[in-house]
Amino acid sequence: MSDSLRTTNYNDFSVYKDNLLPPAAYFVPFSTAQDALESDPVTARYSSDRVTCLSGDWRFRYYAKESNLPADLDAIAAEMDTVSVPSTWQHTGYEEPYYVNARYPFAPKPPQIPADCPVGVYVKKFEIENTALHHTITFLGVAGSLDLFCNDRYVGYSEGSHNTAAFDLTSYLHAGVNRVAVVNHKWCNGTYMECQDMFRENGIFRDVLLRSHGAFCLEDYVVHTDYADGKYTLSLDLSLGSGSGQVKATLLQEGREVAAQRVENAAGTAHLNFGALEVEPWSAETPVLYDLLLELTGTEGTREAVCRPVGFRHIEIRGNVFYLNDQPIKLLGVNHHDSHPVRGYAMTLWDMERDVQVTKQFNVNCVRTSHYPPDPAFLDLCDRYGLYVVDEADIETHGCQVEMHRPGALSHNPKWRGHFWDRVERMFCRDRNHPCITMWSLGNESHGYKNQDYCYQELKKRTTVPVHYEAVVRTRRWCYDVISEMYPWHNRVHMVAEGKGALPKYYKAPYFLCEYAHAMGMGAGDLEPYVQDFYRGDNMLGGCIWEFCDHAAYHADGPVHYTYGGDHGENKHDSNFCTDGLFFP
């Protein structure tokens, strides 16, 4: 008997995830060490013999109203279109592009959403040859929510558009052709946490990956690169699934073995300690990376190999100065959205690499991932090219302030605590092994501070990397690990840089402008005095210009090529306020 496609998860505040695998680091396994070593970490998902990228043609059906969604998938199977995944509804003709800045796309009354919101159904068939293996499916990005079905059986649910969602499909599959379906609601309760200044889009906008593995496999890995007395040490904590076997870990530089460790009878978890190493540190100026090769051999005979980059860097705040590798640093950054005029959210790896290359060419050394975690490949590129990253959780509730005049409606409400922490935890667990991560950010313009305090306390139990959140500056707490402001006047920045004239609290921690020099029109023409002040005092950490590029929807035909808010018949919009980038779309 088929499970009904019509679940209530998207509108059930108590459910923000269901049957998800625990959050874990991003990696791509191979069956041999040689294949793993020869792979490119950025493109490995497309070349692995243990991972099938399910991106490409999917069957799709769009419903303007959820009430029109049938319960049975077979009832619509013959009436479905073919769409390319990754993509969004707004760039494939199902809905018009829609831009709004700090408001919700509907009248806000959290956690309620419009009951009869649009919904899309995606279907993909694939073949399974070996049912003795375990199989997991991973969605790197789905906006706004997803209910997953496999062979007409309900599997689980996820929200948090820019967070990775992974499910175990093993018990749902059979030999031969299998079918997965994704019911993608336009809005969910979690939409209240995604009120970012951008075009609002929907759909499966990042890659979908199917992994096959034995019982003894790598489920997660955590890299610890501790620093003391001028030396770096390396240790690993591995999660290994069921079964038992041998684990070998090798650190290499350009193919040369630097160190190796082995555990013979590992089961469940394994800890490997390499001790002190002679290694070169990673920084934006010298992004030195090593290869970490993990080889697993199960007692049942299965083999698996993973190769991931590792960088050694040490971050520390002493007083009000931010140090990296024992040197004060300046973050000369930009805010970066996933934005493409043709593909919208669905950026290709080439799009990401182009953006990273451009930032480096213009002497930018930092990116704030405004306002959500990027595709993990973007972080691999930042590791490789050398960019400091402020990795930001997929949290913004700006509309609570602008429309409801209750800025703390979510952040002060303990009922939302689990929703907040889920998004922060999933970002942290996926991205914590990247040397480019220079700060964690708890989100943007979501007021503060009760739920942010909880997230901060939980993060500090797990990491020594500093934690950022701008809005706490307007509370009695004042700051977490750095003082962060957006768009302050020159005179205030100058007083902080000079070490006198500002209130004493401005000097208690490193001072960072998470947004400044709003690049609309001539808005970025006042960079020089800001940058001069960044170099006036060691307490000045720097800042990130708002923002990297204009947002627009491109049309090859028609009277104009680029359109903005209000150009698509929408009543509620924010016009061309999205043309605020350093570069054209």
Enumerate the predicted regions with their spans.
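Active-site-adjacent substrate/metal-binding segments within catalytic domains
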Residues: H91-E127, L133-F139, A143-C150, G156-E159, ...
